[in-house]
């Protein structure tokens, strides 16, 4: 990417876009402060991306979950159990912007981590009906949830939409969840390296970029600690 930048502690992040040649992709990445958050890996299956524990400890739904699912002409990507829930109801509730309104932030006070989610319809190398958004605590009244989101009828080549759960430091966490657009000036295959290089070495855990003009998650690029 032209200038992929990251705060010191972005938490988890996602991006959906098309590279300079028009190839569609998504990227997902993990950072962590604690040993439990750092003891994770990204496992790519044919139509799923799993965040899995590597320590042998207990499963924690806030750390270990299905991060992406794939249908014949769609995908859903996110940072928690909402991905499985939205996948289960997609046939009857395909509008992600409406579905996001049923979500709230993660139950981890006082941080209240946003649930970040993305979805798109796949048509050859096109990404259409793209939604990237979150469920995050409302600033002045954290018992309330707000749902900032972006809808794009089509993503143009050389463009991606991205968001992260946090945008502060490891000692002063600030929640994010607000989608922004960025320029993509290179191949999708170099996105993983660009994101990995932008992350703080002591906090970065894993990054994956998945090419989306395939029937399954077969063409991927990964980086891990």
Show where each model-derived region lies.
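Conserved short alpha-helical segments that host acidic/polar catalytic motifs at enzyme active sites
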Residues: 1-225
């Amino acid at each position: 990417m032209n200038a992929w930048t990251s705060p010191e502690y972005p938490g988890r992040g996602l991006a959906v876009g098309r590279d300079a040649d028009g190839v569609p992709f998504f990227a997902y990445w993990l950072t962590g402060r604690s040993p439990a958050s750092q003891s994770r890996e990204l496992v790519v299956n044919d139509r799923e991306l799993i965040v899995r524990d590597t320590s042998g400890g207990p499963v924690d739904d806030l750390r270990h979950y299905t991060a992406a699912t794939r249908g014949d002409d769609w995908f859903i990507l996110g940072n928690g159990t909402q991905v499985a829930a939205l996948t289960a109801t997609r046939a009857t509730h395909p509008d992600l912007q409406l579905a996001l309104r049923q979500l709230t932030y993660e139950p981890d006070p006082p941080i209240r981590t946003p649930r970040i989610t993305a979805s798109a319809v796949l048509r050859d190398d096109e990404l259409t009906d793209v939604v990237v958004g979150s469920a995050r605590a409302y600033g002045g009244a954290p018992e309330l949830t707000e749902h900032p989101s972006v809808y794009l009828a089509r993503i143009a080549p050389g463009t991606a939409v991205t968001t992260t759960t946090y945008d502060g430091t490891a000692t002063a966490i600030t929640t994010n969840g607000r989608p922004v657009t960025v320029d993509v000036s290179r191949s999708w295959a170099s996105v993983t390296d660009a994101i990995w290089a932008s992350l703080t070495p002591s906090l970065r855990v894993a990054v994956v970029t998945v090419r989306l003009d395939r029937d399954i998650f077969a063409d991927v690029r990964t980086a891990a600690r």
